[in-house]
Amino acid sequence: MARPQLLSIPERLDANPRFTGRGVVIALVDSGFYPHPDLMRPKRRIKAYADATRDEAVADDFFTPRAASWHGTMTACTAAGNGYVSGGRYRGLASEAEVVLVKAMSSEGKITGKNVAHAIRLPLRYPHLGIRVLNVSLAAPSSDPDLPEVEAAVAEVVAAGITVFAAAGNTPGRPSRPPASAPEAITVGGLDDKGEREGDASLWPSSYGTIREGLDKPDLVAPAIWVPAPMLPGTLVAREAVALFQLLSVLEELSVEQGFSEQKQRASHDERSSVNGLIDAVSARINRQKYIGVDYQHVDGTSFAAPIAASVAAQMLEANPSLTPAQIREGLLATAAPMPQYPKIQQGAGFIRPRQAVMWAQQKKQDKFVAAVEEGALE
């Protein structure tokens, strides 16, 4: 059986490899995190870790792989992982950016509007961290009384010069809820590019709709399926992946006649059928669990589309550090590619194009330079 392989996000989106988010700090708000090697090696790029549900962060929660840590670890590595464990293969678009990780789910597994708003405001409390981009891939329940506070937090952070991205959600036909419903957030819906660079793309079934008069979400779409992401080391899922691939390797050896002849035996038809049946069963389990190796799975949902868009913003800021949140929004939407077979309300401006967005940022920088020369500010 051929081992599962996926193209990396930079390959699929035809990103310019010169831009990797160097010098840019991205904050990620999520359920929990773990310092994965894709963020820690060969150089530590986790600038800070915070827990918005407590007065002080608990180191044990961070350094021990926990059930609640997988989602945030995957979103962080989707944006800024360097693919260290995969030899650089499964890297994100902002593979040299620094990250600030902000936990917003309590130890009881609850996500509240109060905690999400507190997490979003972290850059305002710690301006020395230099956060330029913030991604939120979670939301409080629709019944939470503090949802207006979440939208207010987004507005405050964007006003301070930080570009906020939010996952649209995965409920087709239903509008996004805060923070994705905030006018100032760049809300990211889902794209199914079939895991290919030039696949027959379609929309991923994500939330969309009119938030209020004059405000539709999402703003654009990005890959939300076939996204490679690392598993938490030492967890049951990770151990199963190792065991399955080891077992598959042994079974494949047994399935060829040479494997039996080494023991001066000849495989009977029944023996062969039995081994091949096991191969089919193990392969089916690997596919069902979405394993693409002993360290990575492919994941889906707008939770992963949003950090991909955030990583494009980091590339744009690397190309032109003077960009404002309004300009980043303008550039992303201006360079997105509409999908004419779908209504605008489902896709916003269309699917994200990193190379074109970075070129837009570079052109803005050039235009500013030319204007300064013409005005005599530069000689």
Q: Where are the predicted features?
A:
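Active-site-proximal beta-strand/loop segments in catalytic clefts of secreted hydrolases
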Residues: V29-G32, A79-N82, V102-S106, V136-A140, ...
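Substrate-binding/access-modulating region of protease and related hydrolase catalytic domains
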Residues: A104-E184, R212-L215, K290-A306
